[in-house]
Amino acid sequence: MAKIAKRLKELSQKIDSNKEYALSDAIDTIKTLKSAKFDETVEIALKLNVDPRHADQMVRGSVVLPAGTGKKVRVAVIAKDAKADEAKNAGADIVGSDDLVEEIQKGNMNFDVLIATPNLMGLVGKVGRILGPKGLMPNPKTGTVTMDVAQAVNNAKSGQVNFRVDKQGNIHAGLGKVSFSKEQLWDNVSTFVKAINKHKPAAAKGRYIKNAALSLTMSPSVKLETQELLDMK
């Protein structure tokens, strides 16, 4: 712990904690904060001016990052017959129906994303209590309940990021790796922020994005200029 605290203190000296950075400058700065032996994830944290306790202020959706996430994603699909074949041909790692649900009931969930066709959501409901807490429950809002399983598999494999505001109004997401180029990170962050702005609830009042910051897996955070983010449409 002492080593980690010392490293964070050293990295913090590279950041002006009183400054809100333009996105371009923030990306330059976080690239200097790399300290781990692995390829750290670039993470964004947003504080939104919403109260998700009210259904009309929920912010939830998905977006495909243009440069991907840098992470290999294992995709499972619950489908039958032609749709099962479609999923396999699209590159799904696991495809099944009753058999896959049985594996989930046993706790065997060797996948990062679960997609299902609408007609089989009754079957998926049997394992909702297992999938829900892990954030794996298929949902139409994230494009994971669909008859177009091929497109859903492609999106998941291409770097789709799902987002959902928590009870405090926060959204966190990994938007690539520190090894990505500045341009790739810019494209990913701006695409993600545009999606957040697009999902602004009509009931949201005042300044929609209150605070924002970028960080690496093992680094302190760099504050972002919120007005620049609000202008991303």
UniProtKB/Swiss-Prot annotation:
Q: Which SUPFAM superfamilies match?
A: Ribosomal protein L1
Q: Which UniProt keywords apply?
A: Repressor, Ribonucleoprotein, Ribosomal protein, RNA-binding, rRNA-binding, Translation regulation, tRNA-binding
Pfam family membership, one: Ribosomal_L1
In terms of InterPro entries, this protein maps to: Ribosom_uL1_bac-type, Ribosomal_uL1, Ribosomal_uL1-like, Ribosomal_uL1/biogenesis, Ribosomal_uL1_3-a/b-sand, Ribosomal_uL1_CS
Asked if the Swiss-Prot or TrEMBL record annotates the protein with the keyword tRNA processing, the reply is no
Magnesium as UniProt keyword: no
Q: Name one GO molecular function term.
A: tRNA binding
Q: Which residues cross the membrane?
A: none
**What's any one GO cellular component for it?**
cytosolic large ribosomal subunit
* GO biological process entries: regulation of translation; translation
Q: What does this protein do?
A: Binds directly to 23S rRNA. The L1 stalk is quite mobile in the ribosome, and is involved in E site tRNA release. Protein L1 is also a translational repressor protein, it controls the translation of the L11 operon by binding to its mRNA.
Q: Which family is it part of?
A: Belongs to the universal ribosomal protein uL1 family.
- NCBIfam families per the UniProt record, alphabetical: rplA_bact (TIGR01169)
State whether it acts alone or in a complex, and with which partners, per the record.
Part of the 50S ribosomal subunit.
Task: Kindly provide the name given to this protein in its UniProt entry.
Answer: Large ribosomal subunit protein uL1
Q: Provide the species name.
A: Campylobacter jejuni subsp. jejuni serotype O:2 (strain ATCC 700819 / NCTC 11168)
